Amino acid sequence: MCVIFFCADSNPQPGGYKLILASNRDEFFARATLSAAKWANADHVYGGIDLEPGREGGTWLAIGHSAGFFKVGALLNLTGEPKPRDAVGRGMIVADYVTRADEEHSILNYNERLLKDCTKYSAFNFVSIEIGSASQPARVKLLSNVPPTLEDFQNGECYGFGNSLPHSPFEKVRHGKQEFEAIVKAHGEASVETLSAQLMQLLRNKHKFWPDDELKTRAPNWGEGLSSLNVHIEEHAYGSRTHSVVLVDSENKMHFIEETMTGLDPHGEWNKTHIEKDFQNGV
């Protein structure tokens, strides 16, 4: 289970942000993971890396920049769908997208190619964002593979997605999006420190948005435990183990801020990372 909220605007007001993104990664606490960092094999990419045997090198959220633009990829599981026999690992969907800057890996071409081959994976939502010149609107797409669907979303609008189809959101996603919109409206031109603190507070929200018919259908056994933005299901050692905020300001300065568990206890120590990168020379 994961959630993501974002607003992508290629031409924000001075002092505003081209990208405001907040995301929780929900996973088993024991799953081996590298915290957000510049990637060793692609030094223009930033994000966490999955170390699970057989899934090494994949990621759930990453941002990459190149000459003239930057792009973001995020992957969310679609809960409650049957798993294909011999399903291919999904983590490389994001990694392949953000590491390559050629035309074949443009947001349009990459998604159209993925759409033709997406049923070999377990069910997912793939969010892709591409932001370049201020004269061109940000491009935002969401690809779901059950059923195979590719949708476009608008520059400058706030969106929230989770582990259901985009037009059947869980209650926590619906309410979270409303709160995210309020934060963007109130703090969308605030300092990185102020805006990121507000977004982290949203991601830590433990309120259970229950009952939820869609979540009850997709996860009948875990539904109530999964109904908060900040998930913690102690008996299964599962929950929101990583909170991420990614900001790119109007001058193309990127901030990747992450809080992630260092052990198996969500009440224990968390590792805090703040990566700053000036995309100006590349964008």
Curated annotation (Swiss-Prot):
Does the keyword RNA-binding feature in the UniProt annotation? no
Its localization reads: Cytoplasm; Mitochondrion; Golgi apparatus
Q: Which GO terms describe its biological process?
A: Golgi organization; protein secretion
Determine the domain of life of the protein's source.
Answer: Eukaryota
Which InterPro entries does the entry link to? TANGO2 (IPR008551)
Which terms in the GO cellular component ontology are assigned?
cytosol; Golgi apparatus; mitochondrion
Ordered alphabetically, the record's keywords are: Cytoplasm, Golgi apparatus, Mitochondrion
One Pfam family recorded for the sequence: TANGO2
Which family is this sequence assigned to? Belongs to the Tango2 family.
Its function, per the record, reads:
May play a role in Golgi organization.
Q: What is this protein called?
A: Transport and Golgi organization protein 2
UniProt organism field: Drosophila melanogaster (Fruit fly)
